């Protein structure tokens, strides 16, 4: 099939994809917090939302829209600051309401599965670093002169989503084991809220002040 890269390229891409997917970021912090807040269903709902966001980025990149965004300083900055503001909003919610880790029996994960899904979706849609990932990382595994370059680009985008979903699903499954222990220690949960807020704030600052693209 012409849209499939060579086995060597696929192996190199898979190895890089696993390392990238396992690197902590705002989305992984969100998966953990939603899992501890409402159990696996909320963790997987947030994961589904984040993967939907990656799918949107994949389509945009395959159509060339991501390259246009990356080339436009104003558009890039607009998305960058919108993403930073959203991360700060999540940090504020964790500090003000304990929304990051409100356990079952105390109101669930705050807003139900739909909210967990939407939060995961927005955390990836408003991250311009993902745009740059798709326009700088994926092309390294594709020959620009290949007649099937667009199809291979789309295939690798889907492959990265599959890798990310698998890695983070395993992390969510492991995190779910700590739910019972967390319920027995409300103070630890509050400290996790503080940690979550700190992480979101740090990611927001890094995103807003990153400057270079």
Q: What do these predicted regions represent?
A:
Residues 18, 22, 55-59, 92, ...:
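Hydrophobic/aromatic residues within the transmembrane alpha-helices of Major Facilitator Superfamily
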Residues 126-139, 199-206:
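Kinked, hydrophobic transmembrane alpha-helices enriched for aromatic residues
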Residues 71-100, 167-171, 181-213:
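Selective transmembrane alpha-helices of multi-pass membrane proteins
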Residues 108-121, 127, 138:
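Anionic-ligand binding region
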Residues 96-113:
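Flexible cytoplasmic inter-helical loops of multi-pass small-molecule transporters
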Residues 49, 53-65, 87-90, 131, ...:
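Alpha-helical transmembrane segments and their lipid-water interface positions
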